Amino acid sequence: MNNFLQSILDRDPAAKSKLSLILTYPGVKAVFFHRIANFFATAKFDLIARIISQFSRFMTGIEIHPKAKIGKNLFIDHGMGVVIGETSIIGDNVTIYHNVTLGGISPSIDSDNQREVKRHPSLQDHVVVGSGAQVLGPITVRKNAKIGANAVVTKDVPENGVMVGIPAKNVGTASEEFKPYGISDEEKNEEFSE
């Protein structure tokens, strides 16, 4: 838990303390509840898992399916409106902003044939997904990729790719270093040195 909270302090310039993260950050609560719900889902206690997941959704405004696989240090910043689908896989140190959907693209017309099929995206380590982005289908967003705000991504994203637009297009290569809100250290020091 300590490493998880520290990883958020490292990525969010507004975060002031670990206690404030625990008490006031909905993303922290959603990840905590997901760990419990996922435990029950893995143990085949699906109803208990779904009840915990629904409680978390009502408390946080963040919907994470209990069977989604989430790595270490997922940071959901602001969080309201985030949806993470059942077959989503999220790597370590991923950052997701508000109103993001990791969803499927197939309508649920023939649910029986879709139950054991990968329908949702996989995000590898150190991916950042901007607010309002829709990452849809059984695609892979590779390590260190950045998805811009409101982008609609329906195809695989290369490592260090920068995806923007509708439909999303790769417009460059991302730095491997995480910079909150894209602010460099020089810009931060210039703006706040008074």
Name each model-derived stretch.
Residues 48, 52, 95, 101, ...:
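Extended, non-globular alpha-helical segments
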Residues 54-64, 108-113:
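Short gly/ser/thr-rich secondary-structure transition/capping motifs
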Residues 106-107, 139, 174-175:
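Conserved catalytic-core motifs of eukaryotic protein kinase domains, centered on the activation segment
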Residues 1-60, 176-194:
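Terminal amphipathic alpha-helical/low-complexity segments used for targeting or macromolecular assembly
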Residues 20, 24, 58, 82, ...:
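Conserved short-loop catalytic and cofactor-binding motifs
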Residues 113-136, 166-194:
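C-terminal segments of enzyme domains that contribute to small-molecule binding surfaces
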Residues 60, 65-66, 71-72, 77-86, ...:
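Left-handed beta-helix
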